[in-house]
Amino acid sequence: IVRADLNELRAKILELGRDNILCVLSTTSCFAPRARDDVETIATICKEANIGHVINNAYGLIDSKCCHAVNQACRVGRVDAFVQSTDKNLMVPVGGAIVAGPNKKFITRIGENYPGRASMSPILDLFITLLSLGKDGWKQKLKERARNVPVLVESLRQVAEKYGKRVLETSKGNNISIAVTCDGVEDPTELGSWLFKRSVS
């Protein structure tokens, strides 16, 4: 499994010095075979070094393990902000993000940096979607996703085996995406274009 090297992070902080580092950017949600970073330990390192820490939680709202990791990071160390995508998590069109964090003043200051010029569409789309789903509807969607992920993995495994490929085992550190080997494919970019033409993303 591929993830951030914590020893390298510590060494780089010592090499550069905290005054030369704006922040550390970690991630909970990424494409397999990369796994979720150990955001709890990174938060502890950032707290000890007094360096800002931003978590890319792009897909994380739909995965309870990612949410738990972010909550723990906020509790045990330093997290200045975490950012989530509305389209990836909340079934709305592309273009919106939720910036949150444990320090309300800091998040308010972020919001004040771009007053009045952003489009209202992402906020309105999100508001309408959440109102129509309601709390119970949202929880039901999360349960459906949790039930469907193992089914998708098993179905992909069967298709992969049929064509002499395999699904990479990344579920211990990545519940967001699934990777299939493409060894033997002469031009992987051509495979990407085939998938794109068939609306597979």
Language-model features and meaning:
Residues 79, 151-201:
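Conserved C-terminal alpha-helix-loop-beta "cap" of PLP-dependent enzymes
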